Amino acid sequence: MDSLKNMIFDLSESNGTSGAEGEISDIIENYVSAFAEVKKDKFGNVTAYMPAGEKTILLDAHMDRIGMIVTHIEDGGFLRVAKCGGMDARVLAAQDVTVWGRKPVYGVVTSTPPHLSTPEDAKKAKDFDSILIDTGLSKEEAEKLISWGDRITVKCPHGELENGRIFGAALDDRAGCAVIIRAARLVAESKDRPSVKLLFSGQEETGGDGAVTGSYNLVADECLSVDVSFADAPDMPSEKCGKLNKGPMIGIAPVLDYRISQKLKETAEAKKIPYQLEIMGDSTGTNADDIAISKGGIRTGLVSVPQRNMHTGVEIISLEDVENSAKLIAEYILGGGLDA
């Protein structure tokens, strides 16, 4: 699975915070254009079409990543920031970051030494109003390279753990992007299947707008949305988490089409693909919520890759879970989808 691993690392290390997905969209286009016709819509979503049968199945994954946005340049070259997506302020102290200015500028989130912290400081994380980034530049130097509105991402080298697990930044949802690219490759040579459309959507982390606009334009009979979800770890509620190396999580929720969820389960069992269930009592917090009500409604299912350390600079997934997620989706498509 080295080629899959390398693709995930390639995707995860690229820029592409919400609303500034240009770099990641180019990388995705490069991968997908090898087997499908690729376009970019007005919103910046990357779409692709693989024609075959009358029925059309849409595969969706969001390509944006969480980060920060520059709001002010202070004296001494320090940057004030706001979060861009669900960045967790608790894990930012002393992190090294990249500011995507006129050229990449490296910086470090400031941190108060414990010797100078008050007891109250130790009890809480800084909020974004008090977070500063040290660039090492003077204000005048910083203003030549950095503008208000430039995006910032946490730097994280990718790597491997034991038992086929990998870590890196932005695996939410670059892992999902890898899943649908891999699934599309697995079915590309078959013509005895439904037509397939791919949607690599922007701005999921700031509200899901890319899925709204993208699914409206891409007419489809049904959709499988792919994202990450919680994987178990110490002190995590086990009933709300999947497990690493135990297969994709098949979503069951009111907004999801129950027949698709059942067909995914049946497909996994028939093809001996390990899977887990993810039960949600209302919405899913993913693009599936928006796609399901697009236009007159699209029957939508959800497949998730279990992930630890979500919304941090170092997220952990199982490479095996990514491969099995792609296999499940490919077998679902080759089986004709719903009501085949």
Where are these regions (language model features)?
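N-terminal hydrophobic/helix-forming segments and targeting peptides
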Residues: 1-340
